[in-house]
Every structure is written in structure tokens, then in C-alpha cells.
């Protein structure tokens, strides 16, 4: 779309059918994860051609108010199950040097929208936060729902890992939401849309640009397109919108407690999806 939206989300399945073909390909991983948890992780491993002639998102404004939803998650028809080599590391990394308190810990990159929270410009009666966002000189209220058990999840993750918030949404929305959500200072860094790579219509989180050893990096995200460059590092989760009985984040804690003790992440993630 010509005018980038404020919030990057996947489509709510209540409103339209989504990615049914893609979901079929990941059922095997979901089955193995169900053996460890009562609810499945929406698990996917993708490989694709990588285009290094990246086009930046257009900034031409053609409408007064950007739409709420910038969809991120659909893969283009040309994205076949093949892998291209990762390019040389960038001269400047996205993350600062590791602090002494995080030395020896793995880095967990955590998505925001539909992973930890769900946000809407439409009023939500039970919203946990209401965040004012300025768009074209007008203040709009964004209503934010916290995913069940997000507090317990973040607190435990902060104890086990170097945690980084990485969202394809804009900082003007995501930063104040993170201020309200992360009361414990779990996130050592926050990365927003400008830190993503715009690839074939999606905002991709290129983990090679973080400045961390990839064998010790995990990404937690509901959108397969977000980690399409590094699917072997992903712990996918189901998109969350408003189900207050959801326990996915709570169910993930034991898995991450085990993963934190591993020398590298690939073996455990590979075994998990190949049982």
C-alpha cells in the first residue's frame, strides 16, 4: 500500500480465511508441539529465495489516515522451498554490545502484535491500555488488549534470556505500548519497522543484522513472513486476537526453560519439529 500503516498485523481469521495452504504445510510441527503442551504452537519452517535488491516502503501519502492493518504474513507465489546464502554481516549492527548481565545468555527476539497484544482503533470495552497516537496532526486512540499470561511470560523470559522487542509496527505506536507492557524492563532493546527489511511486500526481521551469533538467537513471532530469512531460528506462535482462555505463552515457558540450557538453538528446534 502507498501509505504505510501504523500497526503491522495479520488478518483476523474471524473476518476472512487466511493462509490455509501455508497452514497445511506446518501441521507436522504442530503435532509434535502438542505432545509437549496442551495447546499447539502455530509452527512453520519456511525457505525461500532471498532478493537482496530490497525496495524501501513507499512514503507517498494518498490518504488522510493510514489503515490500521498492514498485513504481514502472506508469502508470494514465487517463494519456493529453496534457500539462498545469507550475505556478509552489515558494517553496523542493530543491537549494542552485550551487557555483563546478559553475557552467556541467548538472545530472544519477541514480536509485539498478535504475539503479545492485539490492538485496534475501534473501541474495546476491556482494553488493558489506551494509547494516543498522532497521525497527520490528529490524535487517535489505540485500544490494546494483553494476551493472557503475557506478564508471566515476559518476566520469566527476562530471567533466562537477553530479550529484544522487534516489531514491524511504527515506533510512535509500539514504543508507548512497550512502556506500558514491559513494567520490569525485560526488553534490552526495541526495534521497529525501520529496522526491518522490506522483502516482496513484507517486513522481514533479518536476524543476521542483530550482531549476535545466530546459533544463539531465537525469534518468537506469529507471522512466518517475519522470519522467512531464518526459519530455523523460529518458535512460531498462533496469532492472538481476543481469546481470553488462550494459554500459549504460559505453555511456552517450560520449553524456553529447557532451551536456555542448550549450547545452541538449532538442535532442539529441529528435534521438536521432526518428531
Swiss-Prot record:
**Chain ranges of the FCP1 homology domain:** 101-259
Provide the top EC class.
hydrolase
CDD domains attached to this UniProt entry: HAD_FCP1-like
Q: How is the cofactor bound?
A: Binds 1 Mg(2+) ion per monomer.
Q: Known PROSITE patterns for this protein?
A: FCP1
What Enzyme Commission number(s) appear in the record?
A: 3.1.3.16
The answer to whether the entry has keyword Mitochondrion is no
InterPro entries in UniProt: Dullard_phosphatase, FCP1_dom, HAD-like_sf, HAD_sf, RNA_Pol_CTD_Phosphatase, TIM50
Q: Where is this site: Transition state stabilizer?
A: 167, 205
Tell me if NADP is a UniProt keyword of this record. Answer: no
Q: Which domain of life is it from?
A: Eukaryota
Quaternary form?
Monomer. Interacts with LDB1.
Which purpose does this protein serve, as stated in its record?
A: Preferentially catalyzes the dephosphorylation of 'Ser-5' within the tandem 7 residue repeats in the C-terminal domain (CTD) of the largest RNA polymerase II subunit POLR2A. Negatively regulates RNA polymerase II transcription, possibly by controlling the transition from initiation/capping to processive transcript elongation. Recruited by REST to neuronal genes that contain RE-1 elements, leading to neuronal gene silencing in non-neuronal cells.
Its name, as the record gives it, is: CTD small phosphatase-like protein
Q: Which organism is it from?
A: Gallus gallus
What gene name is given for the protein in this entry?
NFI1
Amino acid at each position: 500500500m502507498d501509505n504505510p500503516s501504523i500497526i503491522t498485523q495479520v488478518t483476523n481469521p474471524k473476518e476472512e480465511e487466511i493462509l490455509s495452504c501455508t497452514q497445511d504445510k506446518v501441521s507436522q510441527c504442530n503435532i509434535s508441539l502438542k505432545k509437549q503442551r496442551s495447546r499447539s504452537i502455530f509452527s512453520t519452517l519456511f525457505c525461500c529465495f532471498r532478493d537482496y535488491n530490497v525496495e524501501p516502503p513507499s512514503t507517498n501519502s494518498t490518504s488522510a489516515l493510514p489503515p490500521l492493518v498492514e498485513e504481514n504474513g502472506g508469502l508470494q507465489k514465487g517463494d519456493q522451498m529453496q534457500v539462498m546464502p545469507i550475505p556478509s554481516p552489515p558494517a553496523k549492527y542493530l543491537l549494542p554490545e552485550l551487557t555483563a548481565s546478559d553475557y552467556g545468555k541467548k538472545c530472544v527476539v519477541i514480536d509485539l502484535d498478535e504475539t503479545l497484544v492485539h490492538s485496534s482503533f475501534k473501541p474495546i470495552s476491556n482494553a488493558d491500555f489506551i494509547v494516543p497516537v498522532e497521525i497527520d496532526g490528529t490524535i487517535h486512540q489505540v485500544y490494546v488488549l494483553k494476551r493472557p499470561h503475557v506478564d508471566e511470560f515476559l518476566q520469566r523470559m527476562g530471567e533466562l534470556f537477553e530479550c529484544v522487542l522487534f516489531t514491524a509496527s511504527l515506533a510512535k505506536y509500539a514504543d508507548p505500548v512497550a512502556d506500558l507492557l514491559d513494567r520490569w524492563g525485560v526488553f534490552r532493546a526495541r526495534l521497529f519497522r525501520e529496522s526491518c527489511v522490506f522483502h516482496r511486500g513484507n517486513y522481514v526481521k533479518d536476524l543476521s543484522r542483530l550482531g549476535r551469533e545466530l546459533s544463539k538467537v531465537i525469534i518468537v513471532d506469529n507471522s512466518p513472513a517475519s522470519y522467512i530469512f531464518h526459519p530455523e531460528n523460529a518458535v512460531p506462535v498462533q496469532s492472538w486476537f481476543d481469546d481470553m482462555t488462550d494459554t500459549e505463552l504460559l505453555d511456552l515457558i517450560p520449553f524456553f526453560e529447557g532451551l536456555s540450557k542448550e549450547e545452541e538453538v538449532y538442535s532442539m528446534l529441529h528435534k521438536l519439529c521432526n518428531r
